[in-house]
Design a protein with these regions (language model features):
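Glycine- and acidic-residue-biased ligand/ion/polar-headgroup-sensing regions
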Residues: 39, 43-45, 49-51, 58-83, ...
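Short, conserved, surface-exposed binding loops centered on an aromatic residue
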Residues: 111-112, 171-176
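C-terminal, non-catalytic macromolecule-binding modules
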Residues: 115-171
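A short hydrophobic beta-strand segment most commonly corresponding to one strand
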Residues: 115-134, 179, 231, 244-257
Length: 257
């Protein structure tokens, strides 16, 4: 992408090109230099280069998949003149199917571009933005804190495991102790379902279906439908009286202590 190359400069671009897969530290260092030069570009310069790239891709009239042309044009239409449009060339483009999940460690840049997902993250007060946003971008902190270790997108995707105790539960258990996600799918044949107690507090989100919930901690019955969110105390179970003809789909965030 010549417009991106103009922004990061020939020296940095050649350094990245010379970095081999057998030298991960060298690749990381080169990526850091290139990304930092991009993010520190003078606004008029990167806006001019972005407009040139958009014009070139729009006029090519052919397959632009090699340069993520369709994605670039869509993002530019949503965030015109945003430096984040160029960051797609540093990231993997991942399309998740329903039920799939991925785990991103601390300081790994990412962006949700389209669709809906359930996101859970560790407690943090240092969310730093890189672009594709009208909010403040702290460039110096961002470039310093990021993890520049390259990896294929397949290494970030991990499957859910079906519970041996409850076949309706699929567990997404990431390699950190901060949180876990449960996907609960109840078939239409089940009219009474028990959300089992766990040792931590948890949050229950209803994606599909309707039910009336009861628990020893609740003073009255709770009507649950699409979009309902329920806080469940530690060691508390919830009985769901299902009324949906298509069953229910719920997600539960908790800690596995």
């Amino acid at each position: 992408v010549p417009e991106l190359r103009a922004l990061i400069g020939e020296v940095a671009a050649e350094q990245l090109e010379r970095s081999g897969s057998d030298d991960p530290r060298g690749v990381s260092a080169a990526l850091r230099v290139c990304f930092t030069r991009l993010m520190k570009s003078e606004k008029k310069f990167f806006v001019d280069q972005l407009n040139m790239l958009v014009k070139r891709i729009s006029q090519e009239g052919k397959d632009t998949s090699g340069s993520n042309g369709d994605l670039l044009l869509r993002l530019h239409s949503q965030y015109p003149g945003d430096i984040g449009c160029f960051t797609i060339y540093f990231l993997n483009l991942v399309r998740l199917e329903p039920g799939e999940a991925m785990f991103l460690g601390a300081n790994e840049p990412h962006a949700y571009l389209h669709g809906d997902c359930v996101e859970c993250m560790a407690c943090s007060d240092n969310t730093v933005r890189a672009g594709l946003t009208p909010k403040f971008i702290d460039v110096l902190t961002l470039c310093e804190m990021l993890n520049y270790t390259p990896a294929p997108s397949s290494s970030k995707i991990f499957p859910a495991t079906q519970s041996q105790l409850d076949p309706s539960v699929y567990l997404y258990d990431p390699p950190v102790p901060d949180f876990a996600i449960m996907r609960i799918e109840t078939p239409a044949s089940i009219k009474l379902y028990l959300v089992s107690a766990v040792d931590s507090a948890s949050i229950l989100l209803v994606i599909q279906g309707t039910a009336v919930g009861t628990s020893t901690a609740a003073a009255s019955e709770m009507t649950l439908r699409r979009g309902s969110v329920l806080f469940i105390s530690a060691n508390e179970s919830i009985s769901l009286h299902l009324s949906s003809p298509d069953g229910m789909l719920l997600f539960r965030a908790c800690c596995l202590l």
